[in-house]
């Protein structure tokens, strides 16, 4: 079956070579006569998989030795709770509010008993269309939480704030798509289903001195327990870890994160440049804050937006509908999304615009 152009914000497009390798190895991994889905997580075969995955992500992101790499479950949403539970330790937790997911992280942190939350900067006053300036954080705070890419609103934080306290980053929608210096962060977390692999896996990178600060946490929610058990306190999402390892190998073959970022910038520039010169489509995001991976755009009417999404779907451009809280359209151009798909989308946008400039709406 011919593949379509999948603009889903997550779960998202995976590299075709990875899917093909998964297909080849599905019934018998490494000559074992068993699928990866059937391997014991205590087996040597799976231990090699998770060890290789960790080694690759350390190489790709330049993760120092004094950081632990954890392959967990529960999505980035569980980290909204685990971070304050493990790191706040009676101190103030400081957050930057740049979008829907940041708001959820803030809301969850406020539910943790004994955690005082301060929102130090926000872009909500202009519908999260920009990245706010972040003031100096008091040294008595536990951490500063930021969201490096706002999937729904289409903004990104490329410059990590210098901070006297650990910076915690939700990188779910731009991890491995842009180069970041891991040493600037105390903790990084990301749901896998955008740039890493299938849903069900969460990557956590945490500096060792931040582990074990709080006693008596539930074992599954304790970074210390997870680190001491090599991400296998309970059965990890074995198949998702395996696919992530293959994705890491693919990224390495593309020239690493720097090579991927160069391609992502080229893809994003094509679409942004077209939108900028268009008198039919527009971007709701300030130019300096525009994401490379999630690009929202709108026409001048909800009726045209609806018609565009419907006709795009019929023409093989899937999952372009914007998030229900924002509307319009959103093209998610994650690492595995081909540049040919961007070029094809632009051609379709031009055709749609030319057919509608007389005001006709066909829904």
From Swiss-Prot:
Pathway: Amino-acid biosynthesis; L-serine biosynthesis; L-serine from 3-phospho-D-glycerate: step 2/3. It is found in: Cytoplasm. GO terms for biological process: L-serine biosynthetic process; pyridoxine biosynthetic process. Pyridoxal 5'-phosphate binds at residues 76-77, 101, 151, 170, 193, 234-235. One of its GO terms (cellular component) is cytoplasm. GO terms for molecular function: O-phospho-L-serine:2-oxoglutarate aminotransferase activity; pyridoxal phosphate binding. It catalyses: O-phospho-L-serine + 2-oxoglutarate = 3-phosphooxypyruvate + L-glutamate; 4-(phosphooxy)-L-threonine + 2-oxoglutarate = (R)-3-hydroxy-2-oxo-4-phosphooxybutanoate + L-glutamate. Keywords: Amino-acid biosynthesis, Aminotransferase, Cytoplasm, Pyridoxal phosphate, Pyridoxine biosynthesis, Serine biosynthesis, Transferase. Disulfide bonds: none annotated. Its main location: cytoplasm. The modification N6-(pyridoxal phosphate)lysine is found at residue 194. L-glutamate binds at residue 42. Catalyzes the reversible conversion of 3-phosphohydroxypyruvate to phosphoserine and of 3-hydroxy-2-oxo-4-phosphonooxybutanoate to phosphohydroxythreonine. Belongs to the class-V pyridoxal-phosphate-dependent aminotransferase family. SerC subfamily. Homodimer. This is Phosphoserine aminotransferase. The gene is serC.
């Amino acid at each position: 079956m011919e593949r379509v152009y999948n603009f889903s914000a997550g779960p998202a497009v995976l590299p075709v070579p990875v899917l093909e390798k998964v297909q080849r190895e599905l019934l018998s991994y490494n000559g074992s006569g068993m699928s990866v889905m059937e391997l014991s997580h205590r087996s040597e075969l799976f231990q090699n998989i998770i060890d290789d995955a960790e080694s690759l992500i350390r190489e790709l992101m330049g993760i120092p030795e004094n950081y632990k790499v954890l392959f967990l479950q529960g999505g980035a949403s569980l980290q909204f709770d685990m971070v304050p539970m493990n790191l706040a330790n009676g101190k103030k937790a400081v957050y930057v509010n740049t979008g829907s997911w940041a708001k959820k992280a803030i809301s969850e942190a406020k539910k943790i008993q004994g955690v005082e939350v301060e929102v130090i900067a926000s872009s909500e006053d202009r519908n999260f269309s920009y990245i706010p300036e972040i003031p100096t954080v008091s040294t008595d705070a536990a951490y500063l939480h930021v969201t490096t890419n706002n999937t729904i609103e289409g903004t990104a934080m490329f410059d990590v704030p210098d901070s006297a306290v650990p910076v915690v980053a939700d990188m779910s929608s731009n991890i491995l798509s842009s180069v970041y210096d891991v040493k600037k962060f105390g903790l990084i977390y990301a749901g896998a289903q955008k740039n890493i692999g299938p849903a069900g896996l969460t990557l956590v990178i945490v500096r060792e001195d931040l582990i074990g600060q709080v006693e008596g946490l539930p074992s599954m929610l304790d970074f210390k327990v997870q680190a001491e058990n090599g991400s296998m306190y309970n059965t990890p999402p074995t198949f998702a870890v395996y696919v992530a390892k293959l994705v890491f190998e693919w990224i390495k073959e593309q020239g690493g994160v720097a090579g991927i970022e160069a391609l992502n910038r080229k893809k994003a520039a094509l679409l942004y440049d077209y939108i900028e010169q268009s008198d039919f489509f527009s971007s709701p995001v300030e130019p300096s804050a525009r994401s490379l991976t999630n690009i929202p755009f709108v026409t001048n009417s909800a009726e045209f937006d609806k018609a565009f999404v419907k006709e795009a779907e019929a023409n093989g451009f899937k999952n372009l509908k914007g998030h229900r809280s924002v509307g319009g359209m959103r093209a998610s151009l994650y690492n595995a999304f081909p540049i040919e798909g961007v070029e094809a989308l632009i051609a379709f946008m031009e055709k749609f615009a030319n057919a509608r400039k007389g005001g006709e709406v066909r829904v």
